[in-house]
């Protein structure tokens, strides 16, 4: 069981609410969407999914983590879970494709609702640092056509967008500012039994500069380090 609690996550309340509401609908047997969570690294995308499992496991929620290369086995996975009473989230973490890979094609087919790759008790939740799951290149902009005042993306861009558009719910995440970062640090320090102080805040900012990021993950790692160094000996 994942130990992450939704209540531990800071600065992403709106994102939590959207994903949790969709998940509750799914657990209750109501219509719900496949979900794509995109944005900056370390901002809580995968933590939300794991926190949902922690919160709703007793209500029948289950998580199946799948690497992108294993997405070709989707029909077999669906066959294994179809008819079971639990509600399954097929979870693809940090998903990025670099072309028409087998996993890309399999996922596209599943999101299209192919009978062999869908079940009423299974949804696909994916996280990615790329909004459209694939790298974007400057040269692709040269394919753009202009018809009057309208802009028409080229075929390459259209193909890349086509996969992400198949997810019914998009949830975006953004980098934290300094105050949000320090709030997350304070939350994790409390979690580890330490109190925030002027010294810890100063060290936390130095830590983030060294890491080149003020993400939730960096805040968590700092809090573990600080709490460990300043914990009273037992």
Please annotate each region the language model reported.
Residues 1-17:
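Dynamic helix-loop-helix/coil hinge segments at AAA+ ATPase domain boundaries and subdomain interfaces
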Residues 6-9, 55-88, 95-100:
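AAA+/P-loop NTPase substrate/partner-engagement loops
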Residues 13-28:
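Pre-Walker A adenine-sensing motif
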Residues 29-51:
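Walker A/P-loop nucleotide-binding motif
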Residues 64, 128, 137-138, 145-161, ...:
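Conserved AAA+ ATPase "SRH/arginine-finger" region at the nucleotide-binding site
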Residues 83, 99-149:
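Conserved catalytic/switch belt of AAA+ P-loop NTPases
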Residues 174-234:
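C-terminal alpha-helical "lid" subdomain
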């Amino acid at each position: 069981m994942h130990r992450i609690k939704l209540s531990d996550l800071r600065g992403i309340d709106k994102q939590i609410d959207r994903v949790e509401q969709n998940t509750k609908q799914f657990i209750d047997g109501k219509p719900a969407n496949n979900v794509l969570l995109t944005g900056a690294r370390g901002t809580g995308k995968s933590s939300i999914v794991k926190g949902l499992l922690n919160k709703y496991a007793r209500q029948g929620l289950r998580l199946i983590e799948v690497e992108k290369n294993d997405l070709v086995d989707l029909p077999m996975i669906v066959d294994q879970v179809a008819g079971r009473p639990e509600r399954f989230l097929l979870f693809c973490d940090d998903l990025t494709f670099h072309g028409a890979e087998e996993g890309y094609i399999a996922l596209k087919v599943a999101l299209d609702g192919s009978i062999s790759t869908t079940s009423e008790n299974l949804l696909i939740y994916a996280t990615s640092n790329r909004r459209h799951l694939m790298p974007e290149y400057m040269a692709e902009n040269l394919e753009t056509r202009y018809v009057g005042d309208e802009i028409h993306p080229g075929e390459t861009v259209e193909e890349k967008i086509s996969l992400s558009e198949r997810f019914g719910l998009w949830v975006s995440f953004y980098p934290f500012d300094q105050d949000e970062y320090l709030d997350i640090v304070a939350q994790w320090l409390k979690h580890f039994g330490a109190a925030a102080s002027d010294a810890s805040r100063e060290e936390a900012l130095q830590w983030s500069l060294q890491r080149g990021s003020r993400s939730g993950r960096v805040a968590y790692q700092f809090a573990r380090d600080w709490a460990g160094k300043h914990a009273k000996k037992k």
